[in-house]
Design a protein with these regions (language model features):
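C-terminal beta-signal and adjacent terminal beta-strands/loops
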Residues: 633-709
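Face-selective signature of the C-terminal outer-membrane beta-barrel domain
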Residues: 237-263, 287-427, 431-455, 501-513, ...
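Outer-membrane beta-barrel translocator/receptor signature
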Residues: 145-152, 160-209, 235-238, 251
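Short, acidic, small-residue-rich periplasmic hinge/interaction motif at the N-terminus
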Residues: 39-73, 97-98, 138
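Surface-exposed extracellular loop regions of Gram-negative outer-membrane beta-barrel proteins
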Residues: 420, 446-493, 511-529, 647-663
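N-terminal periplasmic accessory domains that precede
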Residues: 50, 80-85, 99-102, 135, ...
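Extracytoplasmic beta-strand/coil segments of soluble accessory domains associated
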Residues: 81-116
């Protein structure tokens, strides 16, 4: 801690010092040393002549750790994801290729801004220089965090009045896409008003999709099909949202509304088809002409009452979203095959939580929630039916949080959801469940932290599977819904360990087991001369995975290095019936060259294929990807030049499916998987005085569909 002392001070000078002054000088130095060790929540440098004392950049809080970004990290980061990557938060990883933040065990991360949940684009609109500190929370007990397993809460600088206007432009070359947005925030007293408008387009004219499929109708009737497809896809999207938030000592209230419009007017393909085998169709060329559009308005409110009697708290929220989706496909291979859907979706949700203290600092939280998903879909073409799905949930939750000490706490929750749903004119199928989890958070000293989590839950149903549609897709394939599917159950157990001995180094290790019971997978079978893809429950899917993620910061924070090593063993006991191993390597590095320029790079490589969850039933492997960013910052102006897939001109996704009646392999190469260059520029214009907190607009609509895939 005592960095240096002037070399010009000679030992002989001390011989003539007054004893009292020498004693006083010694006491001051010892006090400074003690103060530096005690300041675990500050990154400031205190300079007294030649003595330099530096504190740590992280400290423990309830359910997690606070990380304080360095001045250099905030200065060079172009957005929040970039800031988190440079901070190298133990347990988090930022994928530069997908611009996504996830846990090191591949769990979803939910963002909050000053304790209020935020959507992705809202986080994107924030300025890194306004971040005071970052709270990384694991299964936080506060009901406003909705029992999320991983939460990043961004605590922002304060505004008493004023705010800023932000504009950002992102344009890609070779891969033709662009994203243009503007956000504004105004603070006045206890009110914060925010608005955002964003436009996006993507024109991809050279998507390559090649397949090889074997259809086994019987021992004597086997057909092989090879396709070479060139696809053109043009997409555009517009989003706007407004938000008002009121904050006082006792009340937090937010109200927001938004609208999103998305359109894909062009989604066409030219397909060369080659058949071999008995009773095979003739070879030829197929054409696909498809288009789709959808709109999504929403409204949302949230309140939080604090300082109620007995130090209790009351939380609640209500939201409503509406989706309208239209899509059509015309497939021509000899005779045309037309399919279209028109869909309306209604998504109401309301919940309330009451939290109250028990013994000492322990809390009990009770929650009641009602949510519904109402789908009304009209199919035309090869299936002319109207499909209705009503999926309702009523939840009752009780959570208890126990604090053993300042370093150790535990939580347990019991949840009883009652799911009652109906398909078309059938009666309601009512199924109660018992879900729950237990979690342990703890620290051993100041350098070691442990997190353990185990849960069992009912998985949400996939609306597109629950119908009675039988549809012909092409000359040999069809798709069928299944209204009688069992909901899936999910169980997992996680152990996570983090070692943070010094500011510039951390090591995170995770081991997790997951199981999906009654897994939903495709079942291909012959029916009426077609090979039909049915959706069925079959067996359990299990995965055991482990990851090790060291992080190192050198040269006073100028050079940051992180690398994730990943291993997984995956098994399926159903009709998919496989056992495979998967390995991954994901390094990241950033370097601040000077005050204005910095460079960062991220690489990802999977060494084997892995299982694609969600009812697709395929195994897949992605090409490796090296992305390099060169960034420039000056005041409120930021610019970033990025090169995606530096090592590989054409990126790809390969997938495989094997069953008794169908074997297939696919190769898909899209412009955004391969090499392209993009330029991002961002500028903010400040007005007023900063003394309250940052942007809080968010788009809270939920995009849902029941259309058969």
């Amino acid at each position: 801690m005592l960095a240096c002392v002037h070399n010009t001070v000679k030992l002989k000078n001390f011989r003539y010092m007054n004893k009292k002054r020498l004693l006083l000088f010694t006491i001051v130095l010892l006090s400074l040393d003690y103060y530096a060790k005690a300041q675990t929540d500050s990154i400031k440098n205190y300079k007294l002549n030649e003595v330099v004392v530096e504190g740590t950049r992280n400290y423990a809080i309830a359910d997690g750790v606070v990380y304080i970004p360095s001045k250099e990290a905030k200065q060079h980061a172009i957005n929040i994801n970039d800031l988190l990557a440079r901070m190298m938060v133990a347990g988090l990883r930022v994928d530069l290729g997908s611009n996504k933040v996830e846990t090191t065990y591949q769990g979803e991360v939910h963002f909050y801004i000053d304790g209020v949940e935020a959507q992705d684009w809202e986080v994107k609109a924030l300025r890194p220089k306004d971040v005071l500190h970052v709270e990384y929370l694991k299964s936080p007990a506060d009901p406003k965090y909705k029992n999320y397993q991983a939460v990043v809460n961004l605590v922002m600088k304060k505004y008493k009045y004023g705010g800023y206007v932000l504009g950002e432009v992102n344009q890609s070359f070779v891969y033709n896409s662009g994203n243009y947005g503007a956000a504004a925030k105004v603070n006045t007293g206890k009110w914060t008003l925010t608005g955002l408008a964003e436009a996006y387009y993507r024109n991809a004219d050279d998507i390559t999709h090649n397949t090889g499929t074997q259809y086994i109708f019987s021992k004597d009737n086997i057909i092989d099909k090879l396709t070479e497809e060139t696809q053109r896809e043009h997409t555009k999207m517009f989003t706007t949202a407004v938000n008002a938030r009121y904050i006082s000592d006792k009340l937090t209230f937010t109200a927001s509304a938004g609208y999103r419009y998305e359109s894909t007017p062009v989604n066409n393909s030219d397909i060369n088809i080659t058949y071999t085998g008995n009773n095979a169709p003739d070879n030829g060329k197929a054409l696909t002409e498809a288009s789709s559009k959808g709109m999504l308005p929403y409204i949302n409110t949230y309140f939080q009452l604090s300082k109620l009697p007995r130090n209790s708290m009351l939380y609640g929220a209500a939201s409503f979203s509406y989706n309208h989706n239209d899509a059509s496909t015309l497939y021509t291979f000899g005779s045309p095959i037309f399919n279209a859907t028109e869909e309306d979706v209604y998504l109401p949700d309301v919940w309330m939580s009451y939290a109250f203290p028990l013994y000492k600092q322990n809390y009990m939280t009770v929650t009641a929630e009602y949510k519904s998903e109402i789908f009304n879909t009209l199919y035309t073409g090869t299936d002319n039916t109207r499909q209705k799905l009503i999926n309702n949930y009523v939840y009752a939750r009780v959570r208890y949080n126990h604090k053993f000490s300042d370093n150790w706490s535990a939580s347990a929750q019991i949840e009883v959801p009652v799911n009652f749903y109906k398909v078309n004119d059938d009666g309601y199928d009512t199924k109660p469940y018992v879900n729950g989890f237990v979690v342990m958070n703890g620290r051993i000293g100041k350098k070691h932290s442990l997190y353990a989590y185990a849960q069992i839950m009912q998985m949400p149903i996939t609306p597109s599977f629950y119908n009675t549609v039988v549809r012909q897709d092409n000359e040999i394939e069809g798709t069928k819904g299944n209204a009688g599917l069992k909901p899936q159950r999910y169980a997992s157990a996680l152990m996570s360990y983090a070692w943070m001995p010094i500011n510039g180094f951390s090591l995170n290790a995770d081991v997790i087991w997951e199981e999906i019971m009654h897994d939903i997978v495709p079942l291909w079978h012959a029916e009426n001369g077609l090979m039909i893809k049915d959706i069925v429950n079959s067996g359990n899917y299990d995965i055991i995975s482990a990851s090790l993620t060291p992080s190192l910061s050198l040269a006073g924070g100028k050079l940051n290095i992180q690398a994730k090593l990943y291993y997984a063993h995956e098994m399926h006991s159903g009709i998919r019936n496989f056992s495979l191993n998967n390995y991954g390597l994901y390094p990241y590095v950033s370097y601040n060259m000077n005050k204005n320029f910095s460079v960062s790079a991220g690489y990802g490589k999977n060494f084997n294929k892995g299982f694609m969850r969600g009812g697709y039933g395929t195994t897949a492997q992605f090409s490796d990807n090296l992305k390099v960013n060169l960034q420039y910052t000056a005041g409120n102006f930021y610019a970033m030049l990025s090169v995606n897939s530096v090592l590989r001109k054409h990126g790809w996704v390969k997938s495989w499916f094997d069953s008794d009646n169908l074997h297939s392999s696919e190769y898909l190469s899209r412009p955004w998987d391969g090499r392209y260059v993009s330029l991002t520029m961002r500028y903010t214009l400040d007005f007023g005085r900063k003394t309250d907190h940052g942007n809080n607009a968010r788009f809270e609509g939920s995009a849902k569909t029941s259309v058969l895939k």
